[in-house]
UniProtKB/Swiss-Prot annotation:
Name of this chain's protein: Endoribonuclease YbeY
GO CC entries: cytoplasm
Cited SUPFAM superfamilies: Metalloproteases ('zincins'), catalytic domain
Keyword Cytoplasm recorded: yes
Function: Single strand-specific metallo-endoribonuclease involved in late-stage 70S ribosome quality control and in maturation of the 3' terminus of the 16S rRNA.
UniProt gene name: ybeY
EC number: 3.1.-.-
Family according to the record: Belongs to the endoribonuclease YbeY family.
GO biological-process terms attached to the record: rRNA processing
Binding residues annotated for Zn(2+), in chain numbering: H115, H119, H125
């Protein structure tokens, strides 16, 4: 399994943790060891552009998934092989959501990584039943990953004095009455 992590933000993020998480989740979902995944951290403007282009929705969002080979979870004896796809996350939006949820930005980004992988595997949350199944699975995966790592907590931080890119995005786009979602 190959997981490439790219950080195009000012956030200081330990890519190895996200690589380990991606490999672990793919193995739990019975994705082939020959499969590839890319996780990219971006600022509000790039994810807002992707959000508009692919979802026709304005403003930055937390995570977007771009499947490649449309792999699905393997059954008990079969592993799927191919390129799983790309996940794009915005730490700025994740930090805002983490604050509202009462946990760390790192925990939120790890949850969003799992959420993105599940989307790549065909999970969705359009109906209440789909939401219950997907959100339950992502929570179970995250808690199990935390338990296996025995609480080894890493942090996502910003260098002192880094401007708030999400607030800047909101200010730049406020003239049109649009703010981050």
């Amino acid at each position: 399994m190959s997981v490439e992590v790219t950080n195009e933000t000012a956030w200081q993020i330990d890519g190895k943790i996200f690589s380990d998480l991606g490999v672990w989740v793919m193995s739990q979902m019975r994705v082939s060891t020959q499969s590839d995944l890319t996780i990219m951290f971006v600022d509000p403007d790039p994810i807002a552009q992707l959000h508009m282009r692919w979802m026709n929705l304005e403003g930055p969002t937390d995570v977007m998934s771009f499947p490649m080979d449309e792999l699905r979870p393997g059954d008990g004896g079969t592993e799927m092989e191919g390129v799983l796809g790309d996940i794009v996350l915005c730490p700025w939006v994740a930090a805002q959501q983490a604050l509202a949820a009462g946990h760390s930005t790192m925990e939120e980004m790890m949850l969003l990584t799992i959420h993105g992988i599940l989307h790549l595997l065909g999970y969705d949350h359009v109906t209440p039943e789909q939401e219950r199944q997907m959100f339950g699975l992502q929570r179970q995966l995250l808690l199990t990953f935390f338990a296996l790592r025995q609480g080894a907590g890493a942090r996502a931080t910003l260098p002192a004095g880094t401007p708030d890119a999400l607030a800047e995005w909101d200010r730049e786009h406020a003239a049109g009455g649009k703010t981050a979602k």
